[in-house]
């Protein structure tokens, strides 16, 4: 049985061109082993508190590429993303807030983690704008949407110059999703969209 104060975190490697990494908390507690770019860990139960997070290149624990203190409140559900380009790697926290969800609906939000992309709009093919003028490191509010299969495009704000086209996004009912834009508009790895099921869909805190 979990402590009533337990929090849940997952890790996301969203740093373009960074190698696969190992992530440790408070010295020797491993949170992620050989986590590659674009990958998430499962949600991990952790106690609230202050943690020292060390990120190393996978299988090389000599010198961390990032050391950061992380304060985690109780009963939090969150994604901890490694973002930015080396050597300016940083940790970015995306909380999954608990909020009402009407039966047979979905909720989506957009998280802009592409370090060289401008502010963008997220658009449906019919021109309907789902999210507008979202800048780097912005997290939108959740938007209620009918469960279905969707296509979206990402374009610099106020233009129809699509930089990413993503078809066949299947949204299930009674679920929360985040659309994470990662990668680079100019360079490799190119911009892509990750669409995981958020922990607030199924984790009770």
Stretches found by the model and what they are:
Residues 1-205:
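Intrinsically disordered, low-complexity polar regions and short flexible loop motifs
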């Amino acid at each position: 049985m979990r402590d009533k104060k337990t929090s849940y975190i997952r890790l996301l490697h969203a740093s373009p061109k960074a190698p696969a990494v190992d992530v440790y908390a408070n010295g020797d507690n491993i949170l992620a082993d050989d986590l590659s770019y674009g990958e998430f860990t499962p949600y991990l139960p952790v106690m609230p508190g202050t943690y020292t997070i060390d990120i190393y290149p996978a299988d090389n624990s000599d010198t961390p590429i990032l050391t950061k203190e992380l304060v985690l409140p109780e009963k939090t559900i969150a994604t901890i993303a490694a973002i930015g380009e080396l050597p300016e790697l940083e940790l970015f926290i995306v909380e999954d807030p608990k909020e009402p969800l009407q039966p047979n609906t979905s909720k989506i939000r957009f998280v802009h983690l592409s370090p060289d992309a401008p502010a963008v709009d997220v658009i449906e093919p019919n021109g309907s704008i789902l999210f507008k003028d979202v800048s780097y490191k912005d997290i939108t509010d959740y938007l209620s949407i009918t469960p279905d299969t969707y296509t979206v495009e990402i374009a610099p704000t106020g233009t129809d110059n699509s930089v990413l086209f993503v078809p066949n996004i299947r949204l299930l009912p009674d679920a929360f999703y985040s659309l994470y834009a990662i990668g680079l508009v100019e360079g490799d790895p190119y911009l892509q969209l990750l669409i995981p099921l958020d922990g607030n869909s199924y984790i009770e805190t």
